[in-house]
Amino acid sequence: MATELPYDLTPELAPLSWLIGSWEGQGRLGDGSADTEIFYQRVDFTELGLPFVEYRAESWLCEADGTLLRPLTVESGFWQVDRERRDGDVGPGMRPADIVPAFRSAEDVERLRAGDEGFGLTATIAHPGSLSELYYGRIKGPQLQLATEAILRGSAAGPYHRATRMAGLVNGQLFWRWDVADAAGAELEAHASAILDRMPSAAEGRLAPGAERPRGAGGRKQGEQS
């Protein structure tokens, strides 16, 4: 089904429009085998009227039936089409952008497309424990791939050397996977993966994490069939 774009959507967000909104569901740590721990996750991609989306993901360890056990972690950041800086961009810091936006139409944004490879994508993600990541990758239709370009670790950070992430929209559900290498020279290993359903946003009166939802309202549990 074609994505319907709001008339007032910032043009540069067109390639990311399928992500915008709230998502919830369950996943597993590690390689996803039956003996790995299950988590419940709520993800928000929020449009702010600027050429990037705000990202926030909250996760809780949970039982297979969705009962929350305890908080797991939170990560947040910003995702945007990768391009060179222009006068129409805000920042650094509180420096205001030029009143004329860098890209004023979808046709302008199309010039950033790299043919069949889609658009460049960059994401900055911050974690608890003094760890931040800078990712670069590609977004092509409802699929994306990212790999770390740089990682900032403070004294509270544990081993974490590089990572890749991928996500895609399949039958209206958001599938994602995250692979991590803890040390230089180490191979990437499965870190976590999940399948999320689109859910009402906070403004639309969404329920508390893990709350029982009417049948057909999303939030499929591990092991349930579509």
UniProtKB/Swiss-Prot annotation:
Binding, heme b: H191
EC number, UniProt record: 5.99.-.-
Record field: catalytic activity: peroxynitrite = nitrate
Enzyme class: isomerase
Pfam name, any one: THAP4_heme-bd
Gene3D superfamilies the record matches: 2.40.128.20
One GO MF term: peroxynitrite isomerase activity
Keywords, sorted A to Z: Heme, Iron, Isomerase, Metal-binding
InterPro entries for this protein: Calycin (IPR012674), Nb(III)_bact/plant (IPR022939), Nitrobindin (IPR045165), THAP4-like_heme-bd (IPR014878)
Cofactor: heme b
Locus of motif GXWXGXG: 21-27
Record region (Disordered): 201-226
Similarity comment text for this entry: Belongs to the nitrobindin family.
Domain statement: Forms a 10-stranded antiparallel beta-barrel structure able to accommodate a hydrophobic ligand in its interior. In fact, this fold hosts the heme group, which is located in a wide surface cleft.
Functional note: Heme-binding protein able to scavenge peroxynitrite and to protect free L-tyrosine against peroxynitrite-mediated nitration, by acting as a peroxynitrite isomerase that converts peroxynitrite to nitrate. Therefore, this protein likely plays a role in peroxynitrite sensing and in the detoxification of reactive nitrogen and oxygen species (RNS and ROS, respectively). Is able to bind nitric oxide (NO) in vitro, but may act as a sensor of peroxynitrite levels in vivo.
Name this protein carries in UniProt: Peroxynitrite isomerase
Organism: Micrococcus luteus (strain ATCC 4698 / DSM 20030 / JCM 1464 / CCM 169 / CCUG 5858 / IAM 1056 / NBRC 3333 / NCIMB 9278 / NCTC 2665 / VKM Ac-2230) (Micrococcus lysodeikticus)
